[in-house]
Amino acid sequence: MAGGVGARVVVGRHIYGNLYGCDPQILRDESALITIIKEATKIANAMLLSVGSYRFGPNGGLTVFAIVAESHISIHTWPEYGFATVDVYTCGDHTDPKAAFDYIVSKLKPQKVEAFFGDRSMYKE
């Protein structure tokens, strides 16, 4: 049931956001973004399964993602606009997606952040 009615049987928390005014250099730095996403996984208390990345052209943006046992973390960048989007979705009470999101934000140093939270849990009557 939506809105937290009944007992929660599956815990799912999704924090995601838009980051404006980031340094374009970091948004192009694949190695740095991979390091950031690996550290964010630890901070979220999630179990890292796989990390991947894709560069869109020689000077284009990047998609960097971590598949974790509890779901995923992703960073998508548009360096030409100083813009990035971040998703941290985890399942389980033991994880802290907000801490991971906040860590990524601290490393990308945006001038403005729009953050959103989604309860992706399942509730049973």
From Swiss-Prot:
Q: What chemistry does it catalyse, as a reaction equation? A: S-adenosyl-L-methionine + H(+) = S-adenosyl 3-(methylsulfanyl)propylamine + CO2
Q: Where's the active site on this chain?
A: 71 (schiff-base intermediate with substrate), 76 (proton acceptor), 91 (proton donor)
What are the record's GO terms for cellular component? cytosol
Q: Which InterPro entries match?
A: AdoMetDC_C, AdoMetDC_fam_prok, AdoMetDC_N, S-AdoMet_deCO2ase_core, S-AdoMet_deCOase_pro-enz
Which keywords label this protein?
A: Autocatalytic cleavage, Decarboxylase, Lyase, Polyamine biosynthesis, Pyruvate, S-adenosyl-L-methionine, Schiff base, Spermidine biosynthesis, Zymogen
Cofactors needed by this protein, per the record, are: pyruvate
Q: In which pathway does it act?
A: Amine and polyamine biosynthesis; S-adenosylmethioninamine biosynthesis; S-adenosylmethioninamine from S-adenosyl-L-methionine: step 1/1
Q: How is the cofactor bound?
A: Binds 1 pyruvoyl group covalently per subunit.
Q: Which residues carry this modification: Pyruvic acid (Ser)?
A: 71
Q: Where is this site: Cleavage (non-hydrolytic)?
A: 70-71
Q: How is it modified after translation?
A: Is synthesized initially as an inactive proenzyme. Formation of the active enzyme involves a self-maturation process in which the active site pyruvoyl group is generated from an internal serine residue via an autocatalytic post-translational modification. Two non-identical subunits are generated from the proenzyme in this reaction, and the pyruvate is formed at the N-terminus of the alpha chain, which is derived from the carboxyl end of the proenzyme.
Q: Name one GO biological process term.
A: spermidine biosynthetic process
Segments passing through the bilayer: none
Would the keyword Cytoplasm turn up in this protein's UniProt record? no
Coiled coil spans: none
Q: Which GO terms describe its molecular function?
A: adenosylmethionine decarboxylase activity
Q: What class of enzyme is it?
A: lyase
EC numbers listed for it are: 4.1.1.50
Which family does the entry's similarity section mention? Answer: Belongs to the prokaryotic AdoMetDC family. Type 1 subfamily.
Query: HAMAP family of this UniProt entry?
Result: AdoMetDC_1
Main function: Catalyzes the decarboxylation of S-adenosylmethionine to S-adenosylmethioninamine (dcAdoMet), the propylamine donor required for the synthesis of the polyamines spermine and spermidine from the diamine putrescine.
Subunit structure and binding partners: Heterotetramer of two alpha and two beta chains arranged as a dimer of alpha/beta heterodimers.
Q: What is this protein called?
A: S-adenosylmethionine decarboxylase proenzyme
